[in-house]
């Protein structure tokens, strides 16, 4: 299977236009870990159940909650391209629950 690529401007992960059409300003994109689980980015509060801790190695991914495509931020920042790293089930299961929790924490 060929690698899919999202559109991105420069080397800026906040400009990703996911293959499904979602953007940061659309339905939103979420910072995630290497398993596609949304991470808790506020180190002043405990990590809510269901979310992942911020990775110690700072290896962050961007999750599209609309379609489940996941992009590796380091690749985008280094190459200016946004290949899909992998996909997760954003509609059901633990990732879907983590997405729900993320939006509750970040309305």
Language-model regions: role of each:
Residues 42-50, 61-68, 94:
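Compositionally biased, non-globular sequence tracts
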Residues 12-55:
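Short recognition patches in nucleic-acid-associated and regulatory proteins
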Residues 53, 59-83, 87:
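Acidic, low-complexity intrinsically disordered segments
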Residues 32-44, 79-92:
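Short cysteine/histidine-rich metal-coordination sites, predominantly Zn2+-binding motifs
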Residues 15-18, 62, 90, 101:
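Intrinsic disorder/low-complexity segments, especially N-terminal tails and targeting/processing regions
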Residues 2-9:
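Short, charged surface segments at domain edges that flank catalytic/cofactor-binding sites
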Residues 48-56, 93-107:
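Short Fe-S-cluster ligation motifs
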């Amino acid at each position: 299977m060929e690698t899919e690529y999202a559109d991105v401007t420069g080397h800026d992960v906040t400009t990703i236009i996911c293959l499904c059409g979602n953007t940061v300003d659309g339905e939103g994109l979420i910072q995630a870990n290497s398993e596609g689980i949304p991470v808790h980015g506020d180190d002043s509060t405990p990590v809510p159940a269901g979310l992942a801790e911020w990775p110690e190695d700072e290896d962050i991914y961007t999750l599209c909650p609309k379609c489940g495509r996941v992009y590796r931020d380091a690749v985008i920042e280094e190459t200016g391209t946004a290949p899909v790293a992998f996909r997760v089930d954003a509609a059901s299961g633990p990732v879907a629950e983590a997405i729900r929790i993320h939006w509750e924490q970040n309305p």
